Every structure is written in C-alpha cells, then in structure tokens.
C-alpha cells in the first residue's frame, strides 16, 4: 500500500468485480488514510469508503476509532438500501486489536473480552442479515489478516502463529462442508472468482483452494523470513542467517526449495512493477 505506482499495476479482483457491474463499498471504524489505505482501496475499485470521519464524534470510543458494533450497523443500513445490483461490501473490524478497549464487559481478561465483543457484533450482524431478501444469494467470507494474539506471546517461528481460519456462510452456500486444503489469503482471489465463473488467469500467485487438481500449499512471510506449508512438510526459513528455523512433517526439507523459489518469483514480479 505504501507504493502507489506499483499497486496501480497489480491485478485486483475487486476492480475486476467492479468492471463486471458490482457495487463496491468498504466499511472501517478507523482512519482510512492509515499507511496509504484509501489510495489502495480507490485503486481497487472502491468508490464508497466509510471510515471514522463518517461517524458522530460520540462513537469514537477507542484508540482505533469507532467500535465494531457501529461499523456493522452502518454496513447493515447500506445493505437495507442497496439496489438490486450485485455487490461486494468489505467490513474491516478493529475492536479485537490491542489495546482491547471495547464497550463490552463480560470477561475479566481484557483480551478475551475484546474477542468476545467482536464475535458478538458479528453474530448480531449475521442474524440481522438473514432477515434481508438479499441473504439467499449472499456469500459472507470471514477471514483474519493475521493472528489474534492468543494465546499470548506466540513465537514468530511457531507455525500456530500463522494458522488462521476462513469461514464461508450465507444463503449462497448450498450445504455444510469442511475444506482441508492448505492455502493463504493470496488464494482468496482465485477461489472466489472460480465460484463466480470468472477468469482468474491474471492472478499468477493465487490458486483455487476448491480445485482438487492443483497443488495446495500455504505461503506466508514476515520481515526477513518466510514459511511454506502443506500436508507433507512445513518449513520456515530465516533469510538473514540463511538457516531453516522450523521444519516438521513426513518429508522434512521437501518444501524449502519451493519456498525459496516462490519468494524469488514474488521479488521478481515486484521489481518489474
């Protein structure tokens, strides 16, 4: 997000949906200009961005801005007046982020209390969304951007730090199912577009997690290190000292060259933009 010229050249599935006639809106209780976020969203096709500036001052109750309940309320109001065009609405929560100052007091542990608050807000939102006519054709995708900081003090080189869920709910989901495929946020683009029968050829690093014919793996990175995991091997590599710092599975070491190659391809792609 900090390199607008490079971002401008990226293929973006949100922009693709806008070109397909989708109505795009983004809802966030914090500062939409934080780290170039607004520029990134506009480039991605979002022409309506709701942020802390769009809420009454009395709702700005936390360090991050407006608590989640008011953000979900704003989203619901927008959905209630939404025209019959296809839409993509994105809600970014923030109340479960430290310092955990939320208008909710049910658990003694402030961290768990904040998690419970966001969970309660989301549950209420889904319950209200089910009452709208649009529910029967709506897909809600729930996914975090990073670990939730619980249990406390998880080491950077602990695989559990990067194990996050992705949950699909909504009237558009035909039946309950559990997907065991390995993947990462990179794969959301191809997976969703495939379900919508839209091309995802432009997203060279993304793969359809529901396609049994492709190799499923998860890639993640953090400053000066990367991880590459699948059902056979999970490896983490420290690029500073050129050492494997974690490796587990039936085929230890198997994914190291794949992880290195993936990282190199990412840098090559970034350098050309």
Residue ranges of each PLM-predicted region?
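Solvent-exposed soluble domains appended to multi-pass membrane proteins
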Residues: 1-273
């Amino acid at each position: 997000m900090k390199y607008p010229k490079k971002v401008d050249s990226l293929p973006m599935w949100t922009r693709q949906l806008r070109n397909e006639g989708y109505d795009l809106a983004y809802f966030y209780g914090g500062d939409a200009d934080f780290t170039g976020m607004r520029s990134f969203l506009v480039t991605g096709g979002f022409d309506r961005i709701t942020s802390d500036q769009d809420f009454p001052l009395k709702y700005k109750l936390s360090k991050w801005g407006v608590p989640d309940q008011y953000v979900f309320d704003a989203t619901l109001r927008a959905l209630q007046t939404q025209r019959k065009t296809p839409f993509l609405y994105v809600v970014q929560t923030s109340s479960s982020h430290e310092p955990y100052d939320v208008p909710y007091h049910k658990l003694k542990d402030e961290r768990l209390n904040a998690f419970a608050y966001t969970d309660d807000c989301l549950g209420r939102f889904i319950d209200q969304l089910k009452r709208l006519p649009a529910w029967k054709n709506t897909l809600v995708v729930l996914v975090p951007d990073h670990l939730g900081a619980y249990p406390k003090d998880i080491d950077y080189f602990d695989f559990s730090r990067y194990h996050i869920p992705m949950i699909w709910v909504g009237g558009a989901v035909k039946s309950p199912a559990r997907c065991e495929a390995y993947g990462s946020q990179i794969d959301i683009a191809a997976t969703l577009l495939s379900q919508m029968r839209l091309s995802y050829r432009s997203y060279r690093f993304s793969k359809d997690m529901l396609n049994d014919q492709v190799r499923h793996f998860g890639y993640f990175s953090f400053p000066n290190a990367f991880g590459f995991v699948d059902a056979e091997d999970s490896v983490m590599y420290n690029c500073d000292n050129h050492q494997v710092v974690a490796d587990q599975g039936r085929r230890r070491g198997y994914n190291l060259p794949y992880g290195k190659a993936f990282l190199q391809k990412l840098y090559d792609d970034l350098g050309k933009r």
